[in-house]
Structures are given as C-alpha cells and as structure tokens.
From Swiss-Prot:
Stored HAMAP family: Ribosomal_uL18_B
Subunit structure, interactors included: Part of the 50S ribosomal subunit; part of the 5S rRNA/L5/L18/L25 subcomplex. Contacts the 5S and 23S rRNAs.
Keyword vocabulary terms for this entry: Ribonucleoprotein, Ribosomal protein, RNA-binding, rRNA-binding
InterPro entries: Ribosomal_uL18_bac-type, Ribosomal_uL18_bac/euk
Function noted in UniProt: This is one of the proteins that bind and probably mediate the attachment of the 5S RNA into the large ribosomal subunit, where it forms part of the central protuberance.
Gene behind the chain: rplR
Gene3D superfamilies listed in its UniProt record: 3.30.420.100
Full protein name: Large ribosomal subunit protein uL18
Swiss-Prot/TrEMBL GO biological process terms: translation
GO cellular component: cytosolic large ribosomal subunit
GO function term, MF aspect, one: structural constituent of ribosome
Amino acid sequence: MDKKTSRLRRALRARKKIQELGVNRLVVHRTPRHIYAQVINPEAQVLAVASTVEKAVKELLKSTGNVDAAKAVGKIVAERAIEKGVATVAFDRSGFKYHGRVAALADAAREAGLKF
C-alpha cells in the first residue's frame, strides 16, 4: 500500500464516523502549493469554502503553500461558516497528519470562533 492509498483509507474511516454523528464537518485538503477548506453539512451540501486559489486570498499572501497561508484560509472559512449560521463542526483532516499546515488551519479556525 502506498502513501496516498493509506491516507485515503484513513480519510474514509474518519468520514464514516463523522457521518454517524450527523454534524457539519470542516474538510481540509492540502497540496504542496495550495490548501483548501470546506464546511459541509450532513446532506453533503457545501456551506462555506476558502482556499489559497482564490484571488482575494492570494493577494494577501506572499506564498500559498506555507503555514501563514493555512492560517489565513482557516480564519476566512471560519468567518464564512459563522456568517451562514454554523458554529460547531467536526474536523475532517482527510487522512493528513494533524501537523504543520493542517494544524495551523485548524487553530486559526478555532481562534476565529469555530468550535470543534
């Protein structure tokens, strides 16, 4: 089993557990160049989105593939989710380790008022 397959297996297992809870989830995906975050409800509807691909976010950042970019995305997605009336979510790290950019995004979302 390669690295990607292992990550996807972990992600699937975590998603099934979150689905059983029936709560909104904050989904994170990272690539070497960008980071993406979405708040998705139990019916699989996307409620809020933020990523380093967005022009408004890109203009604020020097680089899109670092911890500072992840913090910016975390803050923005939390603000957009709270605007839509979502205050509590489950954190879906998509099988990525809770470290570096993933952890920075989560911490920034918490600081912006999202509870998980």
